[in-house]
Curated annotation (Swiss-Prot):
The gene coding this protein: GLR3.1
Gene3D superfamilies: 1.10.287.70, 3.40.50.2300, Periplasmic binding protein-like II (3.40.190.10)
PANTHER family in the record: IONOTROPIC GLUTAMATE RECEPTOR
Tissue and organ distribution: Expressed predominantly in roots. Firt detected in the vascular tissues of the cotyledons, and later in the vasculature of all organs. In leaves, preferentially expressed in guard cells.
Coiled-coil regions listed in the entry: none
Species of the source: Arabidopsis thaliana
Cellular component terms (Gene Ontology): plasma membrane
UniProt name for this protein: Glutamate receptor 3.1
């Protein structure tokens, strides 16, 4: 489009060229009048407001003669009359009159065109109404947007849509660059937030619309769609016509959401004719301008003097128009103070284009245009709109918007949006001194009165039936009919667990969902579930699929599933036999090393306690044969806590207490393991789970129509020649009993139902996939989200479990067998080594203390023993000493204490006699 517009521009220049006069030379460096052009339609809301603001700004700049060094600022207004042709003509005329900058044009489409002229003649062009997001400074370096780009407006709308939880919107817009590119930006912003524009309604320009027929046609289309969130990004006249016809079509009632861009707030602020009843409940946005004394004074001035008793009110674009003039004035002032000139010259490129009726040299090139542009984009000032400053990418600093709700002829501000802080209920400037926090918990808006007068946030969509019922595909199964089946003698009545869950979830929805069930399959064999799911994607056969549909990756790429209503996964089932037929089953709880270690510790602990008790406890003394029997009886009777011998020593009691705790743990574990072995059936199949199933060569059964076949061939690399299709539980049982298959791989719910009737089989190993069953809907279907919420509600209230128990909890088997299968794990030493270690350390510590005391007493008693046993020779052999020590150890502790006491008494007597002898020898004779 831009290249074609350039050709249009060139043709206008050629037509105009014959009437242009040759310029006499460059202007003076500091002319008495500094000219700024402005291109607006004075018969439009924006143009009329801008014209008043321009005059006010011009008056204020010129009120101080020294501001521009004695020069006066003059705004040259060109009335484009909403005509692209006149906009081009006005720009060309300005280029003849040595303007330093141009304010405008009013529309983005003309901004695209005239920016090429500004680039060539280096004349800065500033606009506060042409806010097309695609007007890039890289492509148009001399075009500057002095108000926030519509990119931020669309970002604000996208965050509002996300905040209220909507996912689909409809966009209404005029067929021009600004509206079209704004909607494109909205689509991009929504996509980043996992939302989308489901329909774009393009309307002609408002200058073209002569009757509301096209608007009515689009609104009727929208009324028949699911989405009820409508964004209106149009010109004011078109927007007012849209709301008028929407009211007539009943589209301003409860359930609808209308979001109008800044055009609606501008209409309200400008006091233009508008039936506010037509926009009751509508949300709109307004460029946010902080409250300030300067702004309040200007508003009062506008009301009293500037509008010349006209009805036009001050809208936010009047503030931006005023600030735009000041941006140019300050930039010119900076340029002049820096010693710059304001000079104009002929463009060499245009001068080379000569002909008999062609003279383009009258178009002046602004020599200091690049310098002035640089000063413009580096402007920092406080204006009516707040702080004025540009980012390096030339976007305005801290773009923000007021969010307005129109209620009963009143403007109710529900919050703000800022690119810095997001949605808030306090002015965004209060956040600028803090670190940005865009988390969802910090996004807030006040309550809204929506169309229809409700304060409840609309769902944003409705169930679209278009006069027909929702067509729901259900598998016409030949087996496992407890999940879904045809009612006998009926062509469209369905029953089963899956159907009851679906119907219960539908009842929880806040809106009716008329539906009908349509069978898929012949009822003789189970249908292919992948084909059934594919039917949803076309929208021709089914609008949804209900049944035992596994949620697998391949299917999630083409449809949306609800929250799973039952857990599932592939399992292996194989034949079983009872382990309690083995007479030696009581030995299986422990491994052989465990039995050996346990028996050894019984003996070790018994021996340790005998050593600790032997010298002080008569029950542990006597002939060797009796003592051995005592040790064995005592230690093994601790297994049943029935030992009759009492322990006397402190060390013995400590060891016994620790050992009894260990025995308690061991016996409890043995009892539990033996109970499991005697009650749980064990598989006689060599297949322990999916790993041994893969490595074996046996044949594997699977259910016809299940995804298990593709999973085993594609994911587990099992040869298809090993797979055997089976159609019913009866075929499952026959194939397993006859050895046709070594095992069957199927989903857990089917196997649980199968095992409730066939008790000679059990699940082998654990589930090797994790998935669930859900209901399938087309991609991005809002009904899938609401049904997921309903299923969660069923789960929380316990209703889902009640439905499960009603259909799937029956069992004809006397004992559970499917929940856990395979050989029970035997208990080994590794499970108890910590306790054995504690017992061993306790025994060693106790024996160490015991022998330390014995050796100490033996050392004290040794001389006495030697005298009494008449062994006076100091050359006694080591064997003799050992025999003496063993005799001491075997001796009862009471005798040792008695002997030590007698020894101490003898020592006292000898000491007394010695003292008496020494005393007698000292007496005189």
């Amino acid at each position: 489009m831009l290249s074609s517009m350039n050709w249009v521009l060139l043709s206008f220049i050629i037509v105009l060229g014959g009437g242009l006069l040759l310029s006499e030379g460059a202007s003076s460096s500091r002319p008495p009048v500094i000219k700024v052009g402005a291109i607006f339609g004075l018969n439009t809301m924006y143009g009329e407001t801008a014209n008043i603001a321009f005059k006010a700004a011009e008056e204020d700049v010129n009120s101080d003669p020294s501001f521009l060094g004695g020069s006066k600022l003059r705004i040259l207004m060109n009335d484009a009359k909403r005509s692209g042709f006149l906009s081009i003509m006005g720009a060309l005329q300005f280029m003849e009159t040595d303007v330093v900058a141009i304010i405008g044009p009013q529309t983005s489409i003309m901004a695209h065109v005239l920016s090429h002229l500004a680039n060539e003649l280096t004349v800065p062009m500033l606009s506060f109404t042409a806010l097309d997001p695609t007007l890039s400074p890289l492509q148009f370096p001399f075009f500057v947007q002095t108000a926030p780009s519509d990119l931020f407006l669309m970002r604000a709308i996208a965050e509002m849509i996300t905040y209220y939880g909507w996912s689909d919107v409809v966009a209404l817009y005029n067929d021009d660059d600004n509206s079209r590119n704004g909607v494109t930006a909205l689509g991009d912003e929504l996509e980043e937030r996992r939302c989308k524009i489901s329909y774009k309604a393009v309307l002609p320009l408002d200058v073209v619309i002569t009757s509301p027929v096209e608007i009515i046609e689009e609104l009727i289309k929208i009324r028949g769609m699911e989405s009820r969130v409508i964004v209106v990004n149009t010109f004011p006249n078109t927007g007012k016509m849209i709301f008028k016809e929407a009211e007539r079509l009943g589209m301003m009632e409860k359930g609808y959401v209308w979001i109008a861009t800044t055009w609606l707030s501008s209409v309200l602020d400008s006091n233009l004719p508008l039936d506010t009843k037509l926009v009751n409940g509508v949300l709109t946005l307004r460029l946010h301008t902080p409250d300030s004394r300067k702004k309040r004074d200007f508003a009062a001035r506008w009301k009293n003097k500037l509008s010349n008793n006209k009805t036009i009110g001050l809208n936010v674009y009047g503030l931006y128009a005023y600030d735009t003039v000041w941006i140019i004035a300050r930039a010119v002032k900076t340029l002049l103070e820096a010693g710059g000139n304001l000079s104009f010259s002929n463009d060499a490129k245009l001068g080379s284009l000569k002909g008999e009726a062609l003279n383009l040299s009258a178009l002046s090139r602004f020599d200091q245009g690049s310098q002035l542009l640089d000063y413009i984009v580096h402007t920092k000032m406080s204006g009516l709109t707040g702080p004025v400053q540009f980012h390096p990418d030339r976007s305005m600093l801290q773009p923000s918007y007021d969010i307005i709700n129109l209620v009963d002829d009143r403007v109710h501000q529900i919050g703000y949006w800022s690119n810095y802080s997001g949605l808030s209920i306090v002015p965004p400037e209060s956040f600028y001194s803090k670190p940005p926090n865009r988390s969802s918990s910090n996004q807030h808006l006040n309550s809204v009165t929506w169309p229809g007068g409700t304060s409840v946030t609309p769902r944003g969509w409705i169930f679209r039936n278009n006069g027909r019922r929702l067509r729901i595909g259900v598998p016409d199964r030949a087996s496992f009919k407890d999940f879904v089946s045809r009612v006998n003698g009926s062509s469209n009545k369905v029953q089963g667990y899956c159907i009851d869950v679906f119907e219960a979830a539908v009842k929880l929805l806040s809106y009716p969902v008329p539906h009908e069930f349509i069978f898929f399959g012949d009822g003789l064999t189970n249908p292919n579930y992948n084909e059934l799911v594919n039917k949803v994607t076309t929208g021709v056969d089914f609008d949804a699929v209900v049944g035992d549909i596994a949620i697998v990756t391949k299917r999630t790429r083409i449809v949306d599933f609800t929250q799973p209503y039952i857990e599932s996964g592939l399992v292996v089932v194989a034949p079983v036999t009872r382990l309690n037929e083995n007479p030696w089953a009581f030995l299986r709880p422990f491994t052989l090393p465990m039995w050996a270690v346990t028996a050894s510790f019984f003996v070790i602990v018994g021996a340790a306690i005998w050593i600790l008790e032997h010298r002080i406890n008569d029950e542990f003394r006597g002939p060797p044969r009796r003592q051995i029997i005592t040790i064995l009886w005592f230690t093994f009777s601790t297994m049943f806590f029935s030992h009759r011998e009492t322990t006397v020593s402190t060390l013995g009691r400590m060891v016994l207490l620790i050992w009894l705790f260990v025995v308690l743990i061991i016996t409890s574990s043995y009892t539990a393991s033996l109970t499991s072995i005697l009650t749980v059936q064990q598989l006689n199949s060599p297949i322990k789970g999916v790993d041994t199933l893969i490595s074996s060569t046996g044949r594997i059964g699977f259910q016809v129509g299940s995804f298990a076949e593709n999973y085993m061939t594609d994911e587990l690399n099992i040869a298809s020649s090993r797979l055997v299709p089976l159609a019913s539980p009866e075929e499952y049982a026959n194939a397993l009993q006859n050895g046709t298959v070594a095992a069957i791989v199927d989903e857990r719910p089917y196997i649980d139902l199968f095992l409730s009737d066939y008790c000679k089989f059990a699940i082998r190993g654990q589930e090797f996939t994790r998935c669930g069953w859900g209901f399938a809907f087309p991609r991005d279907s809002p009904l899938a989200v609401d049904m997921s919420t309903a299923i969660l509600g069923l789960s929380e209230t316990g209703e889902l479990q009640k439905i499960h128990d009603r259909w799937l909890s029956k069992s004809n088997c006397s004992s559970p067998h499917g929940s856990q299968s395979g050989d029970s794990e035997q208990l080994n030493v590794h499970s108890f080594w910590g306790m054995f270690l504690v017992v061993g350390i306790a025994c060693l510590v106790a024996l160490f203390i015991h022998f330390f005391k014995i050796i100490r007493d033996f050392c004290k008693d040794t001389p006495e023993v030697v005298v009494e046993e008449a062994i006076p020779s100091p050359k006694s052999s080591r064997l003799t000493k050992l025999q003496t020590f063993l005799a001491f150890v075997d001796e009862k502790e009471e005798e040792t204490k008695r002997r030590l006491k007698r020894k101490r008494n003898n020592d006292h007597s000898m000491n007394a006699n010695s003292i008496i002898s020494r005393t007698a020898s000292r007496r005189p004779i």
